[in-house]
């Protein structure tokens, strides 16, 4: 942390010689400070829009702006600066003394100079909302970035909102069928719930979220909002074109489009990445308040936390555990509590959450666990076996796995599958040391079934067709339960393991077994 502080000190030291001339004017400032009454009477004026301040210091993404006495902008207000013909938005983060605010820039600060004018808009960052946003890509401040002209909507909404009141919230236990076997069977998603996809680098979070967009958003009649937070620009571009090709969106937006996209990718400054999730959520909240059932996808929530940590360090806050911001739980809670289902409409949210160094106890993923209804944990050890989606069947959890919600049969099959896999996991050390021959007959059977179940949990994805060459499969919940029930009961003990790998329903596994037998003969 000392390193980060050094440039700040040097910057301050360098700024001193430049400030020598105006230093004489310091006397009136002291007199102003000596008149607390004047400052207090000036406080109500603070909210007045249009106050003009001047930039006094620029350190990376942090910009200090000095305002006339009594015209200090409120915390979270947006300031506008004309940066060489480009509209730069700054968000007020701290009040320094009586007349200076410290702000976070929502875009690059190259080209800013001291003394430049900054105008207080008198309100937080406002983004366009409503059906006009469908089919369009916006950035954090609501500007279109898809080169399809301005977003023609009169309605705008502040990105900072309070969470719905307790009495407005609604809960109903209903499953959202995704067509992905491992998810629907072992950790089903709740309609109007919050779902987290946890995984390290390169285990398939984005592919899984894209598949969910494909399966759920296409079948779902309502609107979807996708917030790309600090992820690869290429993936955002691919998603945009994929949505147009599949008919979810029309080129350039307009009639027939069903998804709004809000992007703040890896190359953006931390201010934009820390706020873009809120901009996306604001668009989704507006649809919900109009009585819609909305799907809200976020890729990646970790980048929201990471950007918050960068901003926090720039603002000079003392870091907490592992260098994260001291307000980690507050930031996460303020956002997650807004993603909720009310009596007006619902938001079903799917969030990809990067797990640094595959450590689920890291404060960033650990903080988000508490807010979720279902967690899908992607495991590197399963991905290494070539089983995709690499969902860990024992680590993934869901509030919906309850016989009252999913029914007795589904519950019993899910628990049986997990107990077989758990037994296999316990036997793995013995197998590694002594080999299969030392196991009892019963354990040998358990291991054989567990290996088939493991393979049957894999499934070809529609969005991965271009890589794998095998067509995607959507499996009905009844077929999923039937297949795993038969596997646990031993109905398919005679089939080879390979027959269960990368197939949809159990019928396809039987077909594949016949093909394999024919090839072997």
Curated annotation (Swiss-Prot):
Major location category of this protein: membrane
The reaction(s) this protein catalyses: ATP + H2O + 4 H(+)(in) = ADP + phosphate + 5 H(+)(out)
Single GO cellular component term: plasma membrane
Disulfide bond sites: none
Biased composition (Low complexity): 1-21, 28-42
Entry-linked SUPFAM superfamilies: C-terminal domain of alpha and beta subunits of F1 ATP synthase, N-terminal domain of alpha and beta subunits of F1 ATP synthase, P-loop containing nucleoside triphosphate hydrolases
UniProt-listed SMART domains: AAA
Cellular localisation: Cell inner membrane
Region (Disordered): 1-42
Membrane topology: Peripheral membrane protein
InterPro entries with a match to the protein in the record: AAA+_ATPase (IPR003593), ATP-synt_VA_C (IPR055190), ATP_synth_F1_bsu (IPR005722), ATPase_a/bsu_AS (IPR020003), ATPase_alpha/beta_chains (IPR050053), ATPase_F1/V1/A1_a/bsu_N (IPR004100), ATPase_F1/V1/A1_a/bsu_N_sf (IPR036121), ATPase_F1/V1/A1_a/bsu_nucl-bd (IPR000194)
Residues that hold ATP according to the record: 199-206
Functional description taken from the UniProt entry: Produces ATP from ADP in the presence of a proton gradient across the membrane. The catalytic sites are hosted primarily by the beta subunits.
Similarity comment: Belongs to the ATPase alpha/beta chains family.
Subunit structure: F-type ATPases have 2 components, CF(1) - the catalytic core - and CF(0) - the membrane proton channel. CF(1) has five subunits: alpha(3), beta(3), gamma(1), delta(1), epsilon(1). CF(0) has three main subunits: a(1), b(2) and c(9-12). The alpha and beta chains form an alternating ring which encloses part of the gamma chain. CF(1) is attached to CF(0) by a central stalk formed by the gamma and epsilon chains, while a peripheral stalk is formed by the delta and b chains.
Protein's UniProt name: ATP synthase subunit beta
């Amino acid at each position: 942390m000392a390193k980060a502080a050094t440039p700040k000190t040097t910057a301050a030291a360098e700024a001193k010689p430049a400030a020598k001339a105006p230093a004489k004017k310091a006397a009136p400032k002291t007199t102003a400070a000596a008149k607390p009454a004047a400052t207090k009477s000036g406080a109500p004026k603070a909210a007045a829009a249009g106050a003009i301040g001047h930039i006094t210091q620029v350190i990376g993404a942090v910009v200090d702006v000095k305002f006339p006495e009594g015209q200090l902008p409120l915390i979270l207000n947006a300031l506008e600066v004309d940066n060489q013909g480009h509209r730069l938005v700054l968000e007020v983060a701290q009040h320094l003394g009586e007349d200076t605010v410290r702000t976070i820039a929502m875009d690059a600060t190259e080209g800013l100079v001291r003394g430049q004018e900054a105008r207080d808009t008198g309100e937080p960052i406002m983004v366009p909302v409503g059906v006009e946003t469908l089919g369009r890509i916006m950035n954090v401040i609501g500007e279109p970035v898809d080169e399809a002209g301005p977003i023609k909507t009169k309605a705008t909404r502040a990105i900072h909102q309070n969470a719905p009141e307790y009495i407005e919230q609604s809960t109903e236990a209903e499953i959202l069928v995704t067509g992905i076997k491992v998810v629907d069977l072992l950790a089903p998603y709740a309609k109007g719930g919050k779902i987290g996809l946890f995984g390290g680098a390169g285990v398939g979070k984005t592919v899984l979220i894209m598949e969910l967009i494909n399966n759920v958003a296409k079948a779902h009649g309502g609107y979807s909002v996708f917030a790309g937070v600090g992820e690869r620009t290429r993936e955002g571009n691919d998603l945009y074109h994929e949505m147009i090709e599949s008919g979810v969106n029309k080129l350039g937006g307009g009639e027939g489009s069903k998804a709004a996209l809000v992007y703040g990718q890896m190359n953006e400054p931390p201010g934009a990445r820390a706020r873009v999730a809120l901009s996306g959520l604001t668009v989704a909240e507006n649809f919900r308040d109009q009585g819609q059932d909305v799907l809200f996808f976020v890729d990646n929530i970790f980048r929201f936390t990471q950007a918050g940590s960068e901003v926090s360090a720039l603002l000079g806050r003392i870091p907490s555990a592992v260098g994260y911001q001291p307000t980690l739980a507050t930031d996460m809670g303020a956002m997650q509590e807004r993603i909720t289902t009310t009596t007006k409409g619902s938001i079903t949210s799917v969030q990809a959450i990067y797990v640094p160094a595959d450590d689920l106890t890291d404060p960033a993923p650990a903080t988000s666990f508490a807010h979720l209804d279902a967690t899908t944990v992607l495991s590197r050890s399963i991905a290494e076996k070539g089983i995709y989606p690499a969902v860990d069947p024992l680590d993934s959890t869901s509030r919906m796995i309850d016989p009252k919600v999913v029914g007795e049969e589904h519950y019993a099959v899910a628990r049986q599958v997990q107990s077989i896999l758990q037994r296999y996991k316990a036997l793995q050390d013995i197998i590694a040391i002594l080999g299969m021959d030392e196991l009892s007959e019963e354990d040998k059977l358990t291991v054989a079934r567990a290996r088939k179940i493991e393979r049957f949990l894999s499934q070809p994805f529609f969005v991965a067709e271009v890589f794998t060459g095998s067509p995607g499969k959507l499996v009905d919940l009844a077929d999923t339960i039937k297949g795993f029930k038969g596997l646990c009961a031993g109905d398919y003990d005679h089939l080879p393991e390979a027959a269960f790998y990368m197939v949809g329903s159990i019928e396809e596994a039987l077909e594949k077994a016949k093909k394999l037998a024919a090839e072997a003969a």
